[in-house]
């Protein structure tokens, strides 16, 4: 993929951290549908880093990554100054 593909600006974001999985999944799909219908190409999903979880590991991040893989969407961790491992940038072409 070209460098310009990854440098595209984030159009919108949703903060899912502090939600339970089922609630996060519903919110995620609603957000993705809306972003797609608005013609957005790159969005950010905030999952949190897991600092408030019992074992200090993110519960939502691997869950959301699994959904993204299932949906065959391109994604990566946000840049360090934009959320780092607590956020995922998603391309929805």
Language model features with spans:
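Long, charged, low-complexity intrinsically disordered regions
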Residues: 1-93
